[in-house]
A protein has these predicted regions:
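Short linear motifs embedded in intrinsically disordered, charge-biased segments
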Residues: 1-129
Length: 129
């Protein structure tokens, strides 16, 4: 679809790489767009009140950034990841921005600052891949 938008003729579609097409259209990778959306949604969830149902689904009540099933004493079913989706995003954000988990809550509460850090993370990810 992006090749058609870029005006690449049909006989040459298979000869033009994805990177060239993205460069011509000034578009980003889908994986970077998905990461940006996931991190922004995580920030939205973390800005919710502690007893909000959405936050309770992602995190256990009365714990700071402690995803469910980590301290329950149960093992995960065979084939399931050891850490869940929210935990993965939190670790990625903390490693990139070099902040601790409690400090992350302060950063998330400032929406503009959090969005700036997310954009920086996504631009770094786009350069790497």
């Amino acid at each position: 679809m992006l090749r058609r938008i870029a005006g690449i003729p049909h006989p040459y579609i298979s000869r033009v790489s994805n990177a060239t097409t993205r460069r011509r259209c000034n578009a980003t990778r889908f994986s970077v767009q998905i990461l940006r959306s996931q991190l922004r949604w995580l920030g939205h969830v973390l800005r919710r009140p502690q007893n909000d149902p959405l936050r309770l689904v992602v995190f256990e009540p009365d714990t700071e950034l402690c995803p469910r099933l980590t301290n329950t004493g149960r093992k995960r079913v065979v084939g399931r990841p050891r850490i869940d989706w929210a935990q993965t995003l939190i670790e990625m954000f903390c490693n990139f921005s070099q902040v601790s988990r409690p400090r992350m809550l302060e950063i998330v509460s400032d929406k503009q600052r959090y969005h700036f850090i997310v954009e920086r993370l996504c631009s770094q990810t786009a350069l790497i891949s």
